[in-house]
């Protein structure tokens, strides 16, 4: 049995992923900030754990994720407040990576976005700038660690029903989008596939079944 800890467990992708993993027999712990979200998490088959990664230090996060085989970072400040974006999307994310190393949880899957990185190109006066900077810092740090990392880069997210098919790579264009269902399905396949370690997988909805698309990436 694979034991997976999802940080940001009440997010739309996280809830979908927890259900997929629990349905296939994995043990899932979903770490959430708000105790009122515990019921939603439990309905997926995951075990809710209330812990605020924004305020926990590295040791605190390590305690929350110890005894797991993999960590998925699916948390986010959700835009808006710039200081909180850096606190969650950069600083807490980096602490979670250090925590994974400390806890001996080698597998780490980061949900980022298509085009993330130091050359993200988002202007400073754009409301997305802080998020782009925070994700660039977190992803760059993750690549420097000894973790068995994979970074997922979905394009613009939708709530359309999942097709189970994606297109990996290519250049990002304005019309690109991908369903949250498909992102969760990609994360589930990645967790079960060691060949995706040390890969950055950028993708849209497409025509290739997810297992095949990831085999070719």
Regions found by a protein language model. Give the residues of each.
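Flexible, glycine-rich beta-alpha linker
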Residues: 118, 144, 150-170, 203
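Substrate-positioning beta->alpha
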Residues: 93, 134, 152, 174-189, ...
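NAD(P)H-binding glycine-rich loop region in Rossmannoid oxidoreductase-like domains
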Residues: 30-95, 99-102, 191-195
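Active-site beta-alpha turn of Rossmann-fold NAD(P)-dependent dehydrogenases/reductases
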Residues: 75, 109-112, 155, 204
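Conserved Rossmann-fold NAD(P)-dependent oxidoreductase catalytic core, especially the SDR/UDP-sugar
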Residues: 27-31, 35, 77-87, 91-144, ...
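Short-chain dehydrogenase/reductase
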Residues: 200-208
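Glycine/proline-rich active-site loop of Rossmann-fold NAD(P)-dependent oxidoreductases
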Residues: 120, 161-166, 190-199
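N-terminal Rossmann NAD(P)H-binding glycine-rich loop of SDR-like oxidoreductase domains
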Residues: 3-26
């Amino acid at each position: 049995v694979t034991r997976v800890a999802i940080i940001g467990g009440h997010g739309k992708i996280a809830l979908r992923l927890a259900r997929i993993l629990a349905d296939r027999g994995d043990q899932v712990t979903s770490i959430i900030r708000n105790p009122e979200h515990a019921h939603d998490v439990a309905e997926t088959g995951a075990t809710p754990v209330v812990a605020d990664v924004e305020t926990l230090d590295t040791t605190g996060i390590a305690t929350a994720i110890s005894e797991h085989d993999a960590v998925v970072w699916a948390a986010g400040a959700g835009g808006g407040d710039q200081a909180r974006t850096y606190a969650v999307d950069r600083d807490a994310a980096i602490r979670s990576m250090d925590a994974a190393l400390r806890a001996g949880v080698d597998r780490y899957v980061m949900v980022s976005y298509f085009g993330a990185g130091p050359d993200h190109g988002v202007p400073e006066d754009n409301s997305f700038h802080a998020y782009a900077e925070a994700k660039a810092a977190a992803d760059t740090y993750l690549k420097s660690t000894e973790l068995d990392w994979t970074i997922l880069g979905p394009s613009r997210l939708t709530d359309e029903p999942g097709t189970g098919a994606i297109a990996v790579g290519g250049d990002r264009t304005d019309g690109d989008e991908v369903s949250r269902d498909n992102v969760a399905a990609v994360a589930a396949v990645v967790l079960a596939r060691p060949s995706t370690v040390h890969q950055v997988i950028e993708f849209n909805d497409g025509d290739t079944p997810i297992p095949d698309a990831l085999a070719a990436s």
